[in-house]
């Protein structure tokens, strides 16, 4: 018996698409399959390039929140942090957006919330910027700018976090600028701002390879590292302390200097302009004579090396125009005075300029000579250097030949057993 195919008819009441066909059996069949897709909001965490990153604590990459109603409104379970660290990296919040395409302007509210649209553009993506740790460092000397050879010098390094990421694994070591005349420290005192100071031991090896500071430096904070070194060198030599610090940030360096004490004169560098070092003129004990006499400086081992070294005047200036004068006061004792005709004769003075002043590579260059300098003890100013006579440097030195320096005293002046003193006033005149 032949089987005639049955007509399969599928339609709907609202005249939507109809299906007509034939069923190969004698029985009428109708099958309808439904595909149900569960709509959800997926949370994503990416960097500025769109690459997925480790999310903040309390959040899950790819977490899905079901849309439970046709009017579902998504709200994040908690506020997004302004910054966080994960996996050794630091991130700062840039904003978030809804959907698949990143807009030009992100929404910056920290708790994302919005009405869903059920169109495949309901996911939430939070964008964070990966921060690069950066730091600055300074090195200062906390003791005097000169040190006796064999004496100690104390230094302080200040490491400051200049980025939006914490500084970690920080180390400090000597740099290539370190002068051999400075010994390695044996310990460091590390003090985070607002924290507790701790002592870190230092060896020759760690000073070369890097001393771990054992502390992190938060965003916007700093830490100080103080250490002491022994300085050894010749008189007047400049020694440089140079350090490098690094960690999860690129290495940065700083340096400072100290000068080995001069055997004869104090050296104190003015902040702006003035005198770095001035000489003393000591004529020792002289005899009262019946005629005018010129007396030389005293000879002593502790006074300009028994005459083997010269007194000098060293100045610092910043203005392009400068001149120098000097004047001598009347020599007086407790009960007597020498006449104002008394003279201090300094002779001609070679003038030198400096390059790389106060650096280990400091060079002194002779650039000229003054005329003969004779000061009369009546406080009259005598011109020493004329305006713009010497140019091209900010540090100059006048050297006075030890054997040329004389004190001229008239006949029969002075009293036995009296000590006479007078002041030489040096006047540095500068201007634009």
What feature does the model see in each segment?
Residues 1-24, 157, 228-260, 346, ...:
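Serine/threonine-enriched low-complexity regions used as flexible
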Residues 10-13, 18-45, 103-133, 229:
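Conserved "repeat-terminator" motif of extracellular CCP/Sushi domains
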Residues 196-205, 263-432:
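Signature of Gram-negative chaperone-usher
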Residues 1-5, 120-126, 130, 210-241, ...:
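Low-complexity, intrinsically disordered segments enriched in Ser/Thr together with acidic residues
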Residues 1-18, 76-109, 234:
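Surface-exposed interfaces of beta-sheet-rich extracellular modules
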Residues 1, 73-85, 166-180, 324:
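Surface-exposed beta-strand/loop patches in extracellular or lumenal glycoproteins
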Residues 35-62, 127-164, 254-298:
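Serine/threonine-rich, low-complexity linker/repeat segments that form flexible spacers/stalks
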Residues 131-258:
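Exported/extracytosolic protein signature
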């Amino acid at each position: 018996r032949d089987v005639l195919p049955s007509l399969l008819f599928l339609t709907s009441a609202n005249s939507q698409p109809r299906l007509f066909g034939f069923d190969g059996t004698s029985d009428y069949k109708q099958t309808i399959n439904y595909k149900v897709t569960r709509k959800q909001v997926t949370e994503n965490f990416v960097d500025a390039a769109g690459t997925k990153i480790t999310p903040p604590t309390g959040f899950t990459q790819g977490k899905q929140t079901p849309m439970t109603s046709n009017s579902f409104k998504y709200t994040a379970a908690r506020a997004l942090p302004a910054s966080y660290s994960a996996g050794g990296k630091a991130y700062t919040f840039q904003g978030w957006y809804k959907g698949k395409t990143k807009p030009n302007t992100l929404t910056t509210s920290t708790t994302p919330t919005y009405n869903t649209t059920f169109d495949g553009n309901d996911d939430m993506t939070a964008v964070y910027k990966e921060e690069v740790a950066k730091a600055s460092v300074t090195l200062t000397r906390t003791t005097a700018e000169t040190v006796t050879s064999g004496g100690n010098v104390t230094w302080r390094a200040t490491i400051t976090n200049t980025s939006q990421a914490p500084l970690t694994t920080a180390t400090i070591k000597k740099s290539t600028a370190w002068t051999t005349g400075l010994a390695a420290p044996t310990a460091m005192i590390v003090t985070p701002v607002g924290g507790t100071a701790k002592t870190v031991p230092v060896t020759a090896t760690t000073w070369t390879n890097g001393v771990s500071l054992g502390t992190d430096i938060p965003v916007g904070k700093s830490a100080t590292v103080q250490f002491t070194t022994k300085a050894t060198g010749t008189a007047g030599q400049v020694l440089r302390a140079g350090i490098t610090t690094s960690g999860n940030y690129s290495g940065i360096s700083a340096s400072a200097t100290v000068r080995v004490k001069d055997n004869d004169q104090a050296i104190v560098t003015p902040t702006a302009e003035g005198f770095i070092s001035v000489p003393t003129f000591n004529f020792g004990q002289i005899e009262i004579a019946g005629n005018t006499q010129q007396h030389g400086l005293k000879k002593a081992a502790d006074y300009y090396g028994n005459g083997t070294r010269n007194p000098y005047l060293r100045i610092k200036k910043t203005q392009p125009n400068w001149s120098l004068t000097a004047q001598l006061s009347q020599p007086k004792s407790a009960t007597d005075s020498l006449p104002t005709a008394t003279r201090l004769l300094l002779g001609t003075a070679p003038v030198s300029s400096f390059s790389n002043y106060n650096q280990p590579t400091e060079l002194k260059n002779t650039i000229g000579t003054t005329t003969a300098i004779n000061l009369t003890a009546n406080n009259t100013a005598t011109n020493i250097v004329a305006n713009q006579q010497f140019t091209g440097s900010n540090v100059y030195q006048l050297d006075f030949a030890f054997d040329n320096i004389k004190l001229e005293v008239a006949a029969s002046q002075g009293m036995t057993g009296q000590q006479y003193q007078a002041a030489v006033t040096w006047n540095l005149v500068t201007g634009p």
